[in-house]
Amino acid sequence: MYPNVVKAWHYHKKQTDHMACVKGTVKLALYDARKGSPTFKELNEVFMGDRRPVLVKIPPLVYHGFKAVGAETAYIINVPTETYNYKKPDEFRLPPDTRQIAYDWGLAPGLKHG
């Protein structure tokens, strides 16, 4: 991901993601849409990268998105639990500036991706 680019929001119904940023730095935002979860409707941020190595497990029904922060391109690796189904993708999206999730990606007005 290029600096200041935002890729958000999406979630999966079946798939669990396991993500790490191996070069550069990204801000990962998570929004829990799982009814009955103790963290239902909560937002979390995780900064991760080559200087802050973490592996984040993202369960189904948790919206997530990234913003590359810093001056260099960021590289993210994902190891999902499901193979990609081209005929019926397990991916559901919202725009970065959706009103359904009260989160500010720091985008200029009208700009969808930095």
Go through each PLM region and give its residues:
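Conserved SET/PR-domain catalytic core that frames the SAM/AdoMet-binding pocket
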Residues: 53-65
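Non-catalytic, conserved peripheral segments adjacent to functional cores
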Residues: 1-55, 69-114
